[in-house]
Amino acid sequence: MFKNSHKNFFPVPSFLSGPSFGLDISEESIKFTELISHKDGIMLGRYGERDVPAGVIESGKIKNLKKLEEILTSLKKEEKIKSVLVSLPEEQIYLFRIKLEKDGLENIRQSIEFSLEEHIPIPAQDVVFDYEILNEDAKSLNVQVAVIPSNIIEDYVLVFENSGIDVFLFELEAQAIVRAIIRREDPDTYMVVDFGKKRTGISIVSNGILMFTSTVDMGGVILTNVIEKSFKINFEEAEKMKQKYGLSRDSENREIFSVLLNGVSVLRDEILKHFLFWHTNKEEGGKEHPPIKKIILCGGDSNLIGLTEYLSVSMKTKVEVANVWVNISDVEKEIPQMSKEQSLSYATAIGLALGNFEK
């Protein structure tokens, strides 16, 4: 969406002269994935993770540019990375749709710019935006707009320039995830829940288009902290207990179920709120939203035992764990050297790298 500069916007190139690297940046880590084109399609190359110290990035804002530059410079040297596609923090992005009447419309970008302040709480001169035409008829255009504060994107551009890594594209994390886990040209509507360490992204995609995204300050670390406090053990022991028992009612330690259930129910309520809002509110013009076919889970903590079953029963809808290889053509011939559990943490990086293979 945001191509290699905070001032220029171009589509992702449909050709590729070498490997495609996706770089997923968060407060805790930088994950990278390399995808390689070969005669049978696309195959997984290198992948890995680098820790990001606390305080370097907070709520999507880079607080320590020099430290992040050091991490990226080291990654470039160790992995010989030259260019990447990079995720942008959803906490700092505004996503909305507007309808533009064709009568008198001369410049789409200018028309959007004039209406920005009706949709975001930031002056138009202090932001960067890009847009996508969703559909149109004889009289109007339906346009989706993504907006990010200029100072945020400028910091990301600067750290990559200083580390010597070229950026093909800056893209919303949720859009990258959708590219990885939703089959190409799938017309249905899905809710995607990215359950991470410190936060959870909730998105809705319809006909391959990201329609909505929101971030909740609730992640797997909170569940671990609850176990730590309830059982008076250290964090590492609590994390092991969470992974071993999860939400299994039949586990040998039933106390963990009730402890975790309180935390997970908070997440369930947030998911349900967005689920109901989508189904009870109509599109502009009075048309009903298409129904959500199922909820798809990804992110490192979506591996929690019993989570899909709990959400499915409590929300009375189908819930399943994502398949991040659904759009990688060689997976049936050769299983990627990455476990399914591990792959759920790499959904964003894989989706970013896939962007260079879009027609």
Residue ranges and their predicted role:
Residues 1-359:
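Hydrophobic/aromatic-enriched cytosolic interaction surfaces used to assemble or bind macromolecules
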